[in-house]
Amino acid sequence: EHTILVALVGQEILRGKQIREGGVSTDDWLHFIISLVCHDIGYVKGVCRMDRDREHLYATGNGEEMVELSPGASDASLTPYHVDRGKLFIEERFGKNRIIDAEIIKRNVELTRFPVPKEEDHQDTRYFPGLVRAADLIGQLSDPRYLKKIGALFYEFEETGQNKYLNYRHPDDLKHNYPKFYWNVVHPYIQDGLRYLS
């Protein structure tokens, strides 16, 4: 459901960019849409060629490194690895394709890493990688059922230890912190995307 919302938002961002500025080529469109559809594919167990489901071993996306998950662990347990796993999936599926440039898609997906790294190359908000991130964030936070999903999100955070990092003790902490999270963390990265949506 999240990927569908992100793809819909991203398509409208691209449409707005084309209307306002022009210059969005068919190749740009193709790579952008594939990036949107694949941005969270790294959460899916078994999607990378090295994954060994029966042994609960999964590629991290960093070389030959594998991570062992406990039986019954949810896909959220792959959160620390999902961007690198997604880039590995893209390389495995599109690396030899003559039409699709896997490097463009991997760069777009890299900018969906969250929390956003402080490095300069992750600060883009205007170009396609930054707009993929904007679509990801807008798609998630504009989900009409987002507030109802906060409980499940909290338990995903708990499974990965992210709740302690964020200092959330229970699901209501997420709900009460939502405005601060939006304005301080999300808004700086979506302003250009919002401009194309208006």
Ranges and model annotations:
Residues E1-L8, V67-A76:
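Active-site flanking loop/helix segments enriched in acidic
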Residues H31-S35:
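Active-site alpha-helix of zinc metalloproteases
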Residues H2, H39, H82:
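Histidine-centered active-site/metal-ligand motif
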Residues T3-V6, R20-E21, C48, E55-L57:
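A glycine-rich, hydrophobic loop/mini-helix early in the fold
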Residues G86, I104-N108:
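A cyclin-like helical interaction fold
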Residues E12-D28, C38, G42-R49, E92-I99, ...:
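Divalent metal-dependent phosphate-bond-processing catalytic cores, especially two-metal-ion Mg2+/Mn2+ enzymes
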Residues V6-I13, T79-K96:
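An active-site-proximal "capping" alpha-helix that borders the catalytic cofactor pocket
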Residues V47-G72:
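Post-HEXXH active-site segment of zinc metalloproteases
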